Amino acid sequence: MYTEINEMLTPKVLKVQAESPYKARIVLEPLERGFGHTLGNALRRILLSSMPGSAITEASIDGVLHEYSTIEGVQEDVVDLLLNLKSVAIKLTVGNEAQVTLNKEGPCQVTAGDIQLTHGQEIINPELVIANLNEKGKLNMTLKVERGIGFHNTDAFVRYHDDEIEKKTVGKLKIDNSFSPVKKVAYFVDSARVENRTDLDKLTIELETNGTIDAEEAIRISASILQRQLHAFVDMKFEESRADNKERNDFDPVLLRSVDDLELTVRSANCLKAENIHYIGDLVQRTESELLKTPNLGKKSLTEIKDVLASRSLSLGMKLENWPPASLGE
């Protein structure tokens, strides 16, 4: 029987059993009875609804004004084309938005690998069939790719650019899509044993992604999102005892935390510290181009940093007035 919360068991074993680069089974044990379902359900919901990623959100097709059109020489109608585009797994490594093109003449089979990329994009499933063209078929498309979180609903989703609302225009076909790179998640809770105790939980999470992120990274990001949402409860205070607290409260508490809390890889963390980036507030004020000038910090590390910041609703290039607070580090 416990008398203090720090006497409760915490997980000691974390196993990652990779079935493929994009499919894995994560095992966490031992957990106090009931915590398997508590953590498993929370992580599953976050993985399915709140993961950052990239997707095609708009298509402009030559000769097509609306999604109920057909294209001469193309076996699929426009609705089917848009459905196929939703399945393209595309990764943005630079920026939050990009335009790519697709230009093909028949007879041929058009695949995701035929999409003409610019700098900073990668197609993970180039074998995906988008359309089939006969000898009269011609397909010219301009596609808009965006980064985001969760599900993109064209009816309810309104983007703001320079304080102007981006409205749907004729010829630009909006695509309902999910930014989440996670395709399937399931969790199971089994019994675990530690010495004479047999009433413990073992949590197993089975996870499959679309390939733009590996399963282990997806679990790490989802846990970081959950941690951030619970942070307010951990640091809950009812009275301000110091005048410095007012200055600190002008900033999001996350910005005042060490970059170590981002749980970056050792390489990325060391690169940031070498540039005297010790707090998250220091990091978010840097731009992508500034970080890429950092010795030993490449595009892979930059993408990792952007994904972790996005999971906390932060981004690079932010402007923070009166940073740093005088009391930072006390």
From Swiss-Prot:
GO molecular function, one term: protein dimerization activity
Annotated keywords: DNA-directed RNA polymerase, Nucleotidyltransferase, Transcription, Transferase
SUPFAM superfamilies, alphabetized: C-terminal domain of RNA polymerase alpha subunit, Insert subdomain of RNA polymerase alpha subunit, RBP11-like subunits of RNA polymerase
GO cellular component: cytoplasm; DNA-directed RNA polymerase complex
Enzyme class: transferase
Alphabetical list of Pfam families matching this protein: RNA_pol_A_bac, RNA_pol_A_CTD, RNA_pol_L
Chain intervals for the UniProt region annotation (Alpha C-terminal domain (alpha-CTD)): 251-330
Highest taxon above the source species: Bacteria
CDD domains: RNAP_alpha_NTD
Transcription listed as a keyword: yes
UniProt-listed SMART domains: RPOLD (SM00662)
Keyword Signal: no
Domain notes from UniProt: The N-terminal domain is essential for RNAP assembly and basal transcription, whereas the C-terminal domain is involved in interaction with transcriptional regulators and with upstream promoter elements.
Subunit and partners: Homodimer. The RNAP catalytic core consists of 2 alpha, 1 beta, 1 beta' and 1 omega subunit. When a sigma factor is associated with the core the holoenzyme is formed, which can initiate transcription.
HAMAP family: RNApol_bact_RpoA (MF_00059)
Protein name: DNA-directed RNA polymerase subunit alpha
Protein source organism: Legionella pneumophila (strain Paris)
